[in-house]
């Protein structure tokens, strides 16, 4: 392929750009050989003429086709060069928001500066077990590759994370470690990862600082080794640190800070415990104020310091050590602020003895002040003969002080790392490890010094190792494919490394110059010029004699030699170290001890020891002078070699972190900065190595599918695809060097795939043009015929329309004439009527106007008269008030005068009666006051009487005067005339009004009738409309109400279902956790057994029960205390891994544990007391003779008790009858008055129930007491050595005493009825005397035992009262203290405090009462249950005794007669002996195979076990029932544990366990479970035992088996899902193939073909369904199983779809929809579509539809939002970002469209989780499913070997 073909018109190229580095352009003209320029058009439509270098003939880089842009692996690009790499990273980062990209073996990680939801547990589980190229690039994929290669190759691995400061190295390393912790067995973060994460705050505090590029820059490198055992579980970790930047302790550039710990300590200086540190603000110290700003925006140093302290505590650093660490750090700050004064001579200096900073430094480190002051300013020189003490200049002292500060900090740093390693260390043997290296990338600044030199030197070594590894992998790939290997020219940086570290290299010359006493940086630089000026990698700057340039692999770096020697020496004088060694603080002395580090002072300026606290140190070297010998460069070179040795011994994996911009803006890409880092981190070198060979590689099958369109038809006849591919390539590419045929792949040179894509596109374009031509011609013909037919039709219709329109016109003209005639007539009539009505109206209004005017005049005159009347009245009243006010004033003056006189008289009288007033002050005052009041009232009465008489006379005179005036006015003649006129006017007015009113009445009547009629019609119409509206409203309301009620009911139902599902899920999760804990316990027990078998110290065996599972099941004979202790011990051994359980359950368990502990203590005390009593009685009483009691004593005792109870019963009956009569009388009265007999009937029912309960309780008490007495007698008769007879009953869980009177009566009855006993005949003939003596003796013993018991009770009661007394005393003391505190408060506070105290007291009392009620209720239930059990036992014992007695008598009568048993009907019970139980469990459970029962009844073992349980119930043997059920459950667990991957066995025991559970419910006797039973089945119910608790245990066991069944099925299906659902072509020829990169040929991928098709999944599910149906599993459970499996298929498929770019295409959506439809069809064919499995697939269905929908316009966005309701916003956006067209004819999804989708989905409250939880399990429900079989119809096959079972 010639250059002209490549550079043709419309070809896109890359040209350099100063702003964007590279810019895209398109050729507007073909290029020809010899052209000096190219005609280009830029993306902004600008025309550009691009010149070509004629000498080099270097054309611009070609751009890859759009189909290759955005690939996961950069090596999949056809054209591999810098602009292609940069553009691909930019597109992925900005448009798709993908921060990870592969570049061969390198993972490129771009820091997004934003939290992304791609690091959760679900993502970890999705990447776990996947091949590296199958999923999208991720740090988890690299970690999984390392973990997989470690497990497969058994070789240690390393992950090398590098990059600039702020590029995200630490975060990447953190997520890699989290992945290892999760897949390595520490997913709960409770072991190693938690400690490693806890070390992060510490290492950030002491090793991170603010720089100009990063606020939290790590100033050291670390290598963390995560150790694994043989099972590849994490067992420990170890940390090594490198390149600590010590110089930052004493110097910081502008806008930078020292290490964070200094500022954190200053921020916390105000705390009380840090007062002795004498710290203030960070601005006050020299070492923390050089950079300027001491704070970081958004960072709280005090809060970070608290996190640092917590991390120290978590890692086990003691408080004393923490305080010592902080003292050392504070002392460094004080040391930096010491004031050093130069002397006049300039060769010496001194420090003031009163220097506060030096005093604080010495005090904090515990050293001598005078010695440190002296040796800071002096140094000791040692020669062969003498020792000199020499002064130092100011600069030398400052350098020595800084070196000491750096040395102290470096030693402290090492000590902290050592303790972190101790916390991460494990005693177990490490099998392999994975190391994570977090180290600096290549650095270059404006001024580069010794630190940058060390960093770049380390990166040269790492790049060399990287290049060799890449070269090796390329060679292995070529050899594997059997391609001829040709050497590839790649950059070898060994000459640069030799320049630095070889003999007489830069480091060697630097060490040599450091040995010279007066060596300088200038001399060293001159030596470099002289020695290495000829080297290609060394250059001398033109304008400087103190700088030099090294050509590194990434770039040229200019280093300034100033400070190299001083930093390389880093001299710390031994005298200062010796002072620190003599510190009185152990930690300070330990830091500088010789056996710690032989060369502690020369840790590198930016590189400390390579392995801190990891390797053992060598013995210290004796030095001749007083300063240490090894230089920083030497140590750094040694540590670097050790690191390289470690890395070379492992398989490396590379992560290169890129910083996209310096402003830390989220998802902002700066091309310049990115290119710099890509060049520096070796990514472009990887690209160059790949491009030098055959970077594009295609499998034959993929190549054939992609480029089959280029194959000729005759070549398709060949069936050999390899031969077809060879033929096609030989025809298309003429140069044979451009491709190579490998064993399984075809290798192409760079650009060849792009050329093939061009040919393919041309072929498609030609075919498209041909198709378009043909289709367009056909469309035009069809269009012509359609137009012709349409024209004829239009003509016909138009002509008809015109004729119709003419006829219509004529008809309208005629109608218009008629309308005009009638209209004109109507208009004339209306005009006449209008004129007539107007005249009438005008007349009426005129007449009314005149009338109103006359009326208004008359009205005005009348109103004037009224006004005059009221005015005159008002004037008269005002005159009267004026006269009355004057009279009142005169009266007041007179009264005042009179009062003064009276006052004067009273005063005179008061002076004369002074003595009497003193004697009777009170009475006199009262009398005087009363007398005064009476006088005042009399005077007031007189005054009022006088005023009344005066007022009366005045009013009389005024009335007379007014009468006279009225008479005078009436006599005047003018007034009579006005009155007459007024009367006439009034009469005329009334007549006029009468006429008007009559007329108006007539008009109103007429109009009223008319309006009423209209109104009536309107009302009727309105009423009709209202009725219609009301009817519609009622209908709508009814519909709305029904809809609302239905919606509310549905919402409530959904809520209840959801709550039920959550509760069930929570419970089943607890069951699952319990089973996991049980499994963990078994593992730990096995491990402990192995440990105990090893020689050495062994622990004594515990006295715990040997039964493994008794504690798991309720039993009468099993102690709950022991179970709880076992559970607590298990929790302690497991390490509280599941402590995150529900808090309510946890609190209940705690409470139960406390109760059981108290109960255990009480029982222990009682047991000890009982043992003491027994021992005392054994010593006190002599042995007794045998006692033989007649069993007929029980009959006598029963007769006596029966008589007593009968008498009591008669009394109670009489009382009850009287009560019934009284209630009946009252009820009749109430019925007669109210008529409600319900209360009477209810009361009678209650009385009946109470009566029945009383009778039952009486019988129970009688039977129990009888059994107690008989049991005591038998025990006394059977035990010869029994020392005494206990007064307590021996029934388990019972503490009731035997009644004394009952015991005495019982033994009297024995004495009376036992007159024929022969054993006591030696006393008298009848034996009565001996019998009486024996009875009295027994009674005496009973009384003695009872007396002792009472004394013990009395002692216990006394102790209890003492304890109560002490508690009351404590409470009184507390109350007194509270009272004293209350007195100090204000009154309001006292009231409030008192109320609070009362509330708290009442709350405590309420809680105590509730607890007491719970205990009493619990005790009551327990006693009732025991009473029932004992009653049944007593009845069965009596029946057995009677049966035995009758059998004994019958045997005595018929001793010689043989009786044959008749054959009885099988009652559905199976009898077995106790010793056959183990054989039964072995044959029926442990050794049973499901194939043995293939032709029998399903769930036969469950039926057999129930028949055995029923016989044990029939014989009332509770121990047998308990033992059988416990053994069965344990046997099932053992079988499932043994066959934990056998689906058939698990399904078999799930069906049998559920059937046994159903049988226990069906035959329990509960009416709720007996509704579907037949009469025969009801006869098979249990009679004696309530096995409800065992039903719960079986339910839990069923849940565990179900979860194991799902786990097995998921394990079988999961490897098939991705291949069958996403990769397999269900519709042939639909999907295309795209080129793949290096990761698709990763070493972790298996060579075999593991592809599956959808038929494999359906076939496997058919097998599952058949097995479950054959074994009789309930249909409801089968539905739940397939619902869970379909959810797992949905989750795995969707998660892979969200993490794989290669499957997000239209064709995959089509294939996926087809596969889902096939699964739905399978569900319908098996009648499983009602299980809800289809609903679980809804997210996957919507994802498939999303891949097929249009993605361009706003309407498309709305359609997507309305359709994808089951997908979250993140999932929708992720799929759109991943969507990749398979050919160039399909457009990509634009960024604007994705933003539109995001804007429309903002209102959704979606979870932040991207992936579905594939581990989620729906809660299982076991609905009750009774069996129709009867127990007597079941036959046991002989293959079960159960001949020892007897049918009953």
Curated annotation (Swiss-Prot):
Extract the Pfam families matched here: DIL, IQ, Myosin_head
Task: Domain (Myosin motor): give its ranges.
Answer: 69-761
Which SUPFAM superfamilies does the record cross-reference, listed alphabetically?
A: P-loop containing nucleoside triphosphate hydrolases
Q: Describe the location of the Myosin N-terminal SH3-like domain by residue ranges.
A: 8-60
Ranges of residues in domain Dilute = 1526-1803
Q: What is this protein called?
A: Unconventional myosin-Vb
State the compartments where it is located: Cytoplasm
């Amino acid at each position: 392929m010639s250059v002209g073909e490549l550079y043709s018109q419309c070809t896109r190229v890359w040209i350099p750009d100063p702003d964007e580095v590279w810019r895209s352009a398109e050729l507007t003209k073909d290029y020809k050989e010899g052209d000096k320029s190219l005609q280009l058009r830029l993306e902004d439509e600008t025309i550009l003429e691009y010149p070509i270098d004629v000498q080099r003939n270097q054309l611009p880089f070609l751009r890859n086709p759009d189909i290759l842009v955005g690939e996961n692996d950069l090596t999949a690009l056809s054209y591999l060069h810098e602009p292609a790499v940069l553009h691909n990273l930019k597109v992925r980062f900005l448009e798709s928001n993908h921060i990870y990209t592969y570049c061969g073996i390198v993972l490129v990680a771009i820091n997004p500066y934003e939290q992304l939801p791609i690091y959760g547990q679900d993502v970890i589980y999705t990447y776990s077990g996947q091949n590296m190229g199958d999923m999208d690039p991720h740090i988890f994929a690299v970690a999984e590759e390392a973990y997989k290669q470690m497990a497969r190759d058994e070789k240690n691995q390393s992950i090398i994370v590098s990059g600039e400061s702020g590029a995200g190295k630490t975060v990447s390393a953190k997520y890699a470690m989290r992945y290892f912790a999760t897949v390595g067995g520490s997913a709960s973060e409770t072991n190693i990862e938690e400690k490693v994460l806890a070390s992060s705050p510490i290492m950030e505090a002491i090793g991170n600082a603010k720089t100009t590029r990063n606020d939290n820059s790590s100033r050291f490198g670390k290598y963390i080794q995560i150790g694994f055992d043989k099972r590849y579980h994490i067992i420990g970790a170890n940390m090594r640190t490198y390149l600590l930047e010590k110089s930052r302790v004493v110097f910081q550039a502008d806008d930078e800070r020292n290490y964070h710990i200094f500022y954190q300590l200053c921020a916390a200086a105000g705390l009380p415990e840090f007062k002795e540190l004498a710290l203030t603000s960070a601005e006050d110290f020299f070492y923390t104020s050089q950079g300027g700003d001491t704070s970081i925006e958004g960072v709280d140093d005090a809060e970070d310091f608290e996190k640092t302290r917590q991390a120290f505590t978590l890692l086990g650093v003691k408080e004393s050590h923490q305080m010592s660490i902080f003292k050392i750090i504070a002392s460094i700050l004080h040391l930096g602020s010491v004031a050093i004064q130069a002397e006049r001579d300039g060769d010496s200096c001194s420090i003031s003895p009163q220097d506060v900073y030096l005093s604080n430094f010495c005090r904090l480190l515990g050293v001598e002040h005078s010695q440190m002051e002296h040796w800071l300013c002096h140094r000791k020189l040692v020669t062969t003969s003498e020792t000199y003490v020499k002064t130092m200049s100011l600069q030398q002292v400052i350098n020595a002080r800084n070196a000491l500060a750096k040395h102290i900090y470096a030693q402290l740093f090492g000590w902290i790392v050592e303790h972190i390693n101790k916390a991460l260390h494990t005693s177990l043997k490490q099998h392999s490890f994975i190391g994570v290296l977090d180290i600096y990338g290549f650095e270059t600044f404006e001024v580069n010094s010794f630190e940058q030199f060390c960093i770049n030197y380390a990166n040269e070594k790492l790049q060399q190792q990287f290049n060799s590894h890449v070269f090796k992998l390329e060679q292995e790939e070529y050899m594997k494919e059997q391609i001829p290997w040709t050497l590839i020219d790649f950059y070898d940086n060994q000459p640069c490394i030799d320049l630095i570290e070889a003999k007489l290299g830069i480091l060697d010359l630097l060490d040599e110059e450091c040995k010279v006493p007066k060596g300088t940086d200038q001399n060293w630089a001159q030596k470099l010029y002289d020695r290495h000026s000829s080297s290609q990698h060394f250059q001398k700057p033109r304008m400087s004699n103190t700088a030099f340039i090294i050509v590194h692999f990434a770039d040229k770096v200019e280093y300034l030699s100033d400070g190299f020697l001083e930093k390389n020496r880093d001299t710390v004088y031994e005298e200062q170290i010796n002072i620190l060694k003599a510190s009185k603080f152990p930690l300070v002395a330990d830091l500088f001890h010789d056996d710690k580090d032989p060369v502690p002072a020369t840790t590198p300026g930016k590189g400390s020891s390579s392995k801190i606290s990891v390797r053992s140190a060598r013995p210290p070297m004796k030095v001749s002078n007083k300063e240490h010998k090894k230089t920083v460069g030497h140590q750094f070179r040694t540590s670097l070699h050790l690191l390289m040795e470690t890395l070379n011994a492992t398989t490396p994996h590379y992560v290169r972190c890129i910083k996209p911009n310096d402003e830390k803006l989220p998802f902002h890409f700066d091309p310049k900065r990115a290119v710099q880092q890509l060049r520096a981190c070796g990514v472009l070198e990887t690209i160059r190595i790949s491009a030098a060979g055959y970077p594009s590689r295609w499998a034959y099958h993929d190549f054939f599918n992609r480029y089959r369109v280029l194959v000729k038809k005759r070549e398709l006849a060949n069936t050999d695809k390899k031969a077809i591919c060879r033929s096609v390539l030989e025809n298309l590419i003429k140069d044979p060097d451009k491709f190579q045929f490998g064993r399984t792949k075809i290798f192409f040179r760079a650009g060849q795939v792009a050329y093939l894509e061009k040919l393919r596109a041309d072929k498609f374009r030609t075919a498209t043009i041909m198709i378009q031509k043909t289709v367009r011609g056909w469309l035009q013909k069809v269009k012509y015929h359609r137009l012709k037919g349409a024209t004829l039709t239009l003509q016909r219709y138009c002509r008809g329309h015109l004729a119709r329109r003419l006829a219509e016109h004529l008809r309208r003209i005629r109608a218009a004439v008629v309308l005009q005639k009638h209209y004109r007539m109507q208009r004339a009539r209306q005009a006449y009527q209008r004129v007539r009505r107007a005249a009438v109206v005008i007349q009426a209004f005129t007449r009314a106007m005149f009338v109103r005017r006359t009326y208004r005049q008359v009205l005005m005159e009348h109103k004037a008269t009224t006004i005059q009347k009221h005015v005159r009245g008002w004037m008269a009243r005002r005159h009267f008030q004026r006269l009355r006010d004057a009279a009142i004033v005169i009266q007041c003056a007179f009264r005042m005068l009179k009062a003064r006189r009276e006052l004067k008289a009273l005063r005179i009288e008061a002076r004369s009666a002074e003595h009497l007033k003193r004697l009777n002050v009170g009475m006199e005052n009262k009398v005087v006051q009363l007398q005064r009041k009476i006088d005042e009232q009399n005077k007031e009465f007189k005054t009022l009487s006088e005023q009344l008489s005066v007022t009366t006379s005045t009013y009389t005179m005024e009335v007379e005067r007014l009468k006279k005036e009225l008479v005078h006015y009436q006599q005047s003649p003018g007034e009579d005339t006005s009155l007459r006129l007024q009367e006439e006017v009034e009469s005329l007015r009334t007549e006029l009004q009468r006429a008007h009113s009559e007329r108006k009445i007539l008009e109103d009547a007429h109009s009223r009738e008319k309006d009423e009629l209209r109104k009536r019609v309107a009302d009727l119409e309105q009423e009709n409309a209202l009725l219609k509206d009301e009817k519609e409203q009622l209908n709508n309301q009814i519909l709305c109400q029904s809809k609302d009620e239905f919606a509310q009911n549905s919402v409530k139902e959904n809520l209840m279902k959801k709550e039920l599902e959550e509760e069930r899920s929570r419970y089943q999760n607890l069951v699952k956790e319990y089973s996991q804990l049980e499994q963990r316990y078994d593992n730990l027990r096995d491990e402990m057994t192995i440990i105990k078998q090893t020689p050495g110290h062994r622990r004594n065996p515990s006295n715990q029960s040997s039964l493994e599972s008794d504690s798991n099941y309720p039993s009468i004979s099993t102690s709950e205390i022991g179970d709880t202790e076992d559970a607590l011990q298990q929790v302690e051994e497991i390490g509280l891994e599941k402590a995150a359980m529900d808090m309510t359950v946890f609190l209940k368990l705690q409470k139960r544990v406390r109760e059981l502990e108290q109960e255990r203590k009480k029982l222990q005390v009682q047991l000890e007391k009982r043992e003491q009593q027994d021992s005392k009685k054994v010593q006190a009483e002599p042995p007794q003779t045998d006692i033989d009691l007649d069993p007929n004593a029980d009959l006598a005792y029963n007769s006596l008790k029966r008589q007593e109870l009968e008498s009591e019963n008669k009394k109670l009956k009489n009382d009850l009858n009287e009560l019934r009569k009284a209630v009946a009388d009252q009820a009749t009265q109430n019925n007669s008055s109210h008529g409600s007999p319900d209360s009477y009937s209810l009361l009678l029912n209650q009385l009946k129930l109470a009566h029945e309960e009383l009778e039952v309780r009486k019988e129970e008490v009688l039977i129990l007491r009888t059994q107690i007495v008989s049991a005591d007698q038998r025990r006394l008769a059977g035990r010869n050595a029994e020392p005494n007879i206990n007064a307590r009953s021996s029934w388990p869980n019972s503490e009731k005493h035997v009644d004394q009177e009952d015991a005495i009566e019982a033994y009297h009855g024995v004495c009376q009825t036992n007159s024929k006993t022969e054993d006591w005949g030696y006393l008298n003939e009848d034996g009565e005397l001996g019998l009486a003596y024996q009875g009295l003796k027994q009674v005496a013993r009973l009384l003695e035992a009872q007396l002792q018991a009472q004394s013990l009770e009395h002692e216990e009661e006394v102790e209890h009262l003492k304890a109560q007394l002490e508690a009351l005393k404590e409470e009184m003391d507390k109350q007194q203290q509270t009272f004293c505190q209350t007195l100090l408060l204000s009154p309001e506070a006292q009231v409030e405090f008192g109320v609070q105290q009362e509330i708290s007291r009442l709350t405590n009392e309420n809680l105590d009462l509730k607890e007491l009620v719970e205990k009493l209720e619990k005790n009551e239930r327990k006693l009732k249950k025991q009473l029932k059990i004992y009653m049944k036992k007593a009845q069965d014992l009596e029946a057995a005794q009677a049966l035995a007695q009758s059998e004994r008598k019958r045997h005595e009568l018929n001793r010689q007669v043989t009786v044959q048993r008749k054959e009885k009907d099988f009652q559905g019970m199976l009898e077995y002996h106790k010793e056959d139980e183990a054989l039964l469990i072995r044959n029926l459970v442990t050794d049973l195979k499901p194939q043995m029962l293939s032709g029998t009844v399903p769930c036969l073992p469950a039926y057999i076990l129930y028949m055995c349980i029923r016989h044990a119930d029939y014989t009332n043997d509770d121990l047998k029932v308990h033992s059988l059920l416990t053994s069965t459950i344990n046997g099932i667990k053992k079988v499932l544990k043994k066959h934990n991957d056998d689906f058939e066995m698990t399904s078999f025991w799930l069906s049998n366990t559920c059937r046994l559970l159903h049988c226990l419910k069906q035959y329990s006797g509960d009416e709720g479970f007996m509704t579907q039973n037949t009469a025969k089945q009801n006869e098979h119910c249990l009679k004696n035992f309530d096995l409800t608790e065992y039903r719960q245990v079986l339910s839990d066991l069923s849940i565990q088996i179900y979860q194991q069944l799902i786990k097995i099925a998921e394990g079988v299906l999961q490897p098939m899902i991705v291949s069958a659902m996403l990769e397999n072509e269900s519709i042939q020829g639909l999907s295309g193939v795209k080129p793949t990169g290096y990761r698709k040929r990763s070493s972790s991928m298996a060579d075999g073909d593991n592809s599956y098709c959808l038929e494999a999944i359906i076939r496997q599910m058919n097998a599952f369904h058949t097995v479950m149906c054959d074994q009789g599993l309930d249909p409801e459970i089968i539905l739940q199983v397939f619902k869970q499996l379909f959810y797992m298929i949905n989750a795995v498929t969707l998660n892979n779809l969200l993490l794989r770019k290669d499957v997000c295409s239209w064709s995959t959506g089509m294939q996926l929809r087809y596969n889902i439809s096939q699964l739905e069809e399978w569900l319908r064919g098996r009648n499983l579509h009602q299980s809800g499995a289809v609903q679980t697939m809804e997210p996957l269905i919507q994802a498939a539809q999303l891949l097929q929908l249009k993605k361009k316009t706003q309407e498309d966005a709305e359609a997507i939002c309305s359709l994808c309701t089951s997908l979250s916003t993140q999932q929708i956006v992720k799929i759109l970002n991943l969507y990749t067209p398979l050919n160039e004819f399909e457009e990509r999804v634009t960024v604007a469209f994705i933003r539109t989708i995001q804007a429309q989905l903002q209102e959704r409250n979606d979870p932040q989780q991207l992936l579905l939880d594939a581990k989620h399990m729906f809660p299982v429900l076991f609905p009750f499913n009774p069996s129709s079989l009867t127990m007597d119809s079941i036959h046991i096959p002989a293959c079960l070997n159960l001949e020892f079972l007897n049918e009953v």
